[in-house]
């Protein structure tokens, strides 16, 4: 088998690459995917979002090493092992990120990836339903919508934010991210609108696009050039040849793993693994970043939450309704209200994110209390903690070693304590008076810094937004892995395009910027002129210097 372009991974970026690289019909494209089909309600029904992430069929099922700052807990680190990758098992929340995120990328050496450069690509990929005119795309492959917003708890949350003095926003993916508002979802016609549904399946209808299901073992490098990919399928090892380029889009865990298995990475580590060094790039696997979050949960004194739908019988009713009509509760991920807030004066961009949910549930999907309730997933999104991905062994089937070093920076503790206290302030507004019962978690007895820290050590979890392990930067940056054209430094014919190349984590969920990365990388690969830079200026809070709201 051979193709002009061989893409490893059919996730958010890989699917977009397959679509754009094959668009004019001139190039043959072959996608390698270790997982399988996304057919069935567990993936396609939005309300079933907790299921695919817990199923080995769809998830690589990685765990971190014991995290010393989190009571040595091993933190769940899911990645999609299915067409569409993690866009097929995620929460379907769509966030572009803040303009300052991408300006920071350029400052860190990713020339041509400032907000003015990437905004046109966000517009190209979007089919926005109800977004801010002039700031959103309307005819792209990726449908983005808002939920029905029928539960009164959503309205209470947004009204509470206003009462606390915070901004509201009509479209956080438009000119103004900061504030309380309606959350956007990658859902269309009642179905999860993954990268597979948006990009990959339409691309596979073209004669010049193919897919092979198999495990990528390593990239074949001959005389300093990537010429193919060694894969294993059906117990047999074979090589897929690339006549032009190999593009790695295998996730922030598996992309650096593949590079290292292929001899690209920190020289000493590769020597320790018995792998011949093809390119000594110490940045491969370094710079691992992620978002953390905890659940803040409250009893609802009125029976208006989704608690009544948690018993198996009523889940079955919702599932049957969805199967018949693609409607009802099953057609929403139930994340329909949110907030993007600044933790302190002097910040130009938000750094705290809220996902509001009209039910109080545990990470396993069970009720957090025997009563109606509501909760927010709250996290500090600009952590300074950094981790790494390394090889466990030279065996391609071995899981990588994930060391996040969560909460290793003192500022993280200060910010998360603020998150706890700020959430109490928001839930304490009069908008919640009709609904507010006892605090379930952290609990009303958790007040001091020491008590909050103890709660955080036991309850912080990943928000599943890993990035940065194949950092994009200037060629003279010793820690950069790819240049701003996504080319692997030191190896010809090889690129990386996924969230692993982010120089710095963006503020918000990563599916959107990962797809954008695939879109923009495709133009670089094809040698096209980049889309014209935008001259639109995003809203920055005029009170930012003196107030947090």
Curated annotation (Swiss-Prot):
GO BP annotations, alphabetical order: glycine betaine biosynthetic process from choline
Checking Gene3D superfamilies in the record gives: FAD/NAD(P)-binding domain, Glucose Oxidase, domain 3
Entry EC number(s): 1.1.99.1, 1.2.1.8
| InterPro entries found in the cross-reference section | BetA, FAD/NAD-bd_sf, GMC_OxRdtase, GMC_OxRdtase_N, GMC_OxRtase_C
Q: Drop me one GO molecular function for this one.
A: flavin adenine dinucleotide binding
- From the UniProt record, list the reaction(s) this protein catalyses: choline + A = betaine aldehyde + AH2; betaine aldehyde + NAD(+) + H2O = glycine betaine + NADH + 2 H(+)
Which EC main class describes this enzyme? Answer: oxidoreductase
Q: Which cofactor does it need?
A: FAD
- Which of this chain's residues are annotated to bind FAD? 4-33
NAD: is it a keyword of this entry? yes
What are the entry keywords? FAD, Flavoprotein, NAD, Oxidoreductase
Q: Name one GO cellular component term.
A: membrane
Residue positions of the active site? 465
Q: What pathway does the UniProt record associate with this protein?
A: Amine and polyamine biosynthesis; betaine biosynthesis via choline pathway; betaine aldehyde from choline (cytochrome c reductase route): step 1/1
Record family assignment: Belongs to the GMC oxidoreductase family.
Q: What does this protein do?
A: Involved in the biosynthesis of the osmoprotectant glycine betaine. Catalyzes the oxidation of choline to betaine aldehyde and betaine aldehyde to glycine betaine at the same rate.
Q: Which HAMAP family match?
A: Choline_dehydrogen (MF_00750)
What protein name applies here?
Oxygen-dependent choline dehydrogenase
Gene behind the chain: betA
């Amino acid at each position: 088998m051979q193709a002009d372009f061989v893409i490893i991974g059919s996730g958010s970026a890989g699917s977009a690459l397959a679509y754009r690289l094959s668009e004019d019909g001139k190039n043959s494209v072959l996608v390698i995917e270790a997982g399988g089909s996304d057919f069935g309600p567990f993936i396609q029904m939005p309300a079933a979002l907790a299921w695919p992430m817990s199923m080995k069929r769809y998830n690589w099922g990685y765990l971190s090493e014991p995290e010393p700052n989190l009571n040595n807990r091993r933190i769940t680190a899911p990645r999609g092992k299915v067409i569409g990758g993690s866009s097929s098992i995620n929460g379907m929340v769509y966030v572009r990120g803040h303009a300052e995120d991408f300006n920071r990328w350029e400052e860190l050496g990713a020339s041509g990836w400032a907000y003015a450069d990437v905004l046109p690509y966000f517009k190209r990929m979007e089919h926005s339903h109800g977004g801010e005119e002039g700031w959103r795309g309307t005819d792209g492959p990726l449908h983005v919508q808002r939920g029905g917003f029928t539960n009164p708890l959503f309205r209470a949350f947004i009204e509470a934010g206003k009462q606390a003095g915070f901004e509201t926003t009509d479209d956080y993916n438009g000119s103004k991210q900061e504030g309380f508002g309606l959350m956007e979802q990658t859902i269309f016609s009642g179905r999860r609108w993954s990268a597979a549904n948006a990009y990959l399946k339409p691309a596979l209808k073209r004669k010049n696009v193919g897919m092979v299901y198999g495990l990528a073992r390593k990239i074949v490098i001959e005389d300093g050039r990537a010429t193919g990919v060694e894969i294993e399928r059906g117990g047999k090892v074979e090589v897929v040849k690339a006549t032009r380029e190999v593009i790695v889009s295998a996730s922030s865990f598996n992309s650096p793993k593949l590079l290292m298995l292929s001899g690209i990475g920190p020289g000493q580590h590769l020597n320790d693994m018995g792998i011949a060094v093809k390119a000594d790039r110490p940045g491969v696997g370094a710079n691992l970043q992620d978002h953390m979050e905890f659940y803040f949960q409250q009893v609802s004194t009125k029976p208006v939450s989704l608690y009544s739908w948690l018993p198996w019988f009523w889940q079955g009713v919702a599932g049957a309704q969805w199967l018949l009509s693609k409607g009802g509760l099953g057609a929403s991920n139930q994340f329909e209200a949110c907030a993007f807030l600044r933790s302190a004066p002097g910040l130009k961009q938000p750094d705290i994110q809220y996902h509001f949910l009209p039910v109080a549930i545990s990470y396993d999907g069970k009720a957090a209390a025997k009563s109606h309730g509501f909760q927010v997933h709250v996290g500090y999104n600009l952590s300074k903690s950094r981790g790494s991905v390394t090889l466990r062994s030279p065996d391609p089937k071995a899981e990588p070693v994930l060391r996040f070093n969560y909460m290793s920076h003192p500022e993280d503790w200060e910010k998360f304590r603020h998150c706890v206290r700020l959430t109490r302030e928001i839930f304490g507004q009069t908008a919640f008076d009709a609904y507010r019962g006892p605090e379930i978690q952290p609990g009303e007895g958790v007040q001091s810094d020491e008590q909050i820290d103890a709660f955080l050590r036991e309850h912080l979890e990943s928000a599943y937004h890993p990035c940065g392990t194949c950092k994009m930067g200037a060629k003279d940056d010793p820690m950069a892995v790819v240049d701003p054209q996504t080319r692997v430094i030191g190896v010809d014919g090889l690129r990386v395009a996924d969230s692993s190349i982010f120089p710095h984590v963006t503020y918000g969920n990563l599916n959107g910027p990962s797809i954008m990365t695939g879109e923009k990388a495709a133009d670089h690969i094809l040698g096209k002129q980049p889309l014209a830079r935008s001259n639109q200026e995003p809203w920055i809070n005029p009170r930012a210097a003196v107030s947090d709201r």
